[in-house]
Design a protein with these regions (language model features):
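Repeated loop/turn-to-beta-strand initiation elements of outer-membrane beta-barrel proteins
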Residues: 60-66, 89-96, 126-132, 167-176, ...
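Gram-negative outer-membrane beta-barrel proteins
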Residues: 39-45, 64, 73-77, 88, ...
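Transmembrane beta-barrel strands of outer-membrane/channel proteins
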Residues: 35-41, 67-71, 96-102, 118, ...
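Outer-membrane beta-barrel architecture
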Residues: 55-57, 81-83, 117-121, 161-167, ...
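Detector for outer-membrane/organellar transmembrane beta-barrel domains
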Residues: 111-183
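Short glycine/proline- and aromatic-enriched beta-strand/turn motifs that initiate or cap beta-hairpins
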Residues: 19-73, 238
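Outer-membrane beta-barrel "beta-signal"
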Residues: 200, 225-239
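Residues that define the transmembrane beta-barrel architecture of outer-membrane proteins
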Residues: 29-31, 46-52, 74-78, 102, ...
Length: 239
């Protein structure tokens, strides 16, 4: 991941040297509303729970924002994400991304996560694109049973991700993501998460998709510990 991230940064810097090829803002905005249903399975493949989520996003290519929440039995998640990355030579985007996440387990604990750092994307504008990010990661947790003695627990950490997206035909997108976090799950570095997914666009305003999310605990500093997977079905509306 470090080598790929470095290569992307090197090429983006070369393009950045030509200021005429930089676009700082696109006025056209694409808004989407996505609703999903997720089934979580444990490492023995037994189903643990189901969850529903909804997310709104606004994308102007260089400037994007999205926010959503996820509900499970006794668990609530909220995430907001913003990114600004000027377009360089039509193919590269380099900028800053920030993420804010709140997770509450009813009567057990709550936590707040904040990530901010460098974001890179390369898009061929035809069939393939790759994006990557490296972030400072701040986590703050409050355990209700000991809150009178230890009000808060803090941690300063690191987060990374890389995603490949392939569009073999016009309306079909396939993607793979390897990261230390997901949109609603933020573990300390490095508990890898591998996501495989696809989305088919039936019309200009609606598409359906499916994702398989395989989760591990501490794959690299200890022996790999498979922690289960999530299977998510979603519908996306564009307007």
């Amino acid at each position: 991941m470090k080598k790929i991230f470095g290569i992307l940064l090197f090429f983006a810097f070369n393009f950045f040297c030509d200021a005429q090829n930089i676009n700082f803002f696109t006025s056209k905005i694409e808004k989407t509303l996505t609703g999903g249903l997720t089934f979580r399975h444990l490492s023995d493949f037994s189903m643990e729970n189901a969850a529903a989520d909804i997310c709104f996003s606004a994308d102007m290519k260089e400037l994007s924002f999205n926010s959503g929440f996820k509900l499970r039995s006794g668990i609530f998640d909220f995430t907001a994400q913003a990114c600004y990355a000027p377009t360089i030579a039509r193919h590269f985007n380099v900028g800053i991304m920030s993420i804010f996440h709140v997770n509450v387990y009813s009567d057990i604990f709550s936590e707040i996560d904040f990530l901010t750092g460098l974001y890179l994307k390369y898009d061929t504008l035809k069939h393939f694109k790759i994006s990557s990010g490296i972030f400072y990661f701040y986590k703050e947790a409050r355990i209700f049973s000991i809150a009178d003695k230890i009000p808060r627990i803090y941690n300063h950490n690191l987060a990374k991700y890389i995603e490949f997206c392939f569009t073999p035909i016009q309306n079909l997108s396939l993607y793979m993501n390897l990261a230390s976090y997901t949109y609603y799950r933020y573990t300390l570095y490095f508990s890898p998460d591998l996501k495989l997914g696809g989305e088919y666009r039936f019309s200009d305003w609606v598409s359906l998709g499916n994702e398989w999310d395989f989760q591990y605990i501490d794959m690299f500093t200890l022996s790999a510990n498979y922690n289960g997977f999530e299977n998510r079905f979603f519908v996306k509306l564009r307007f």
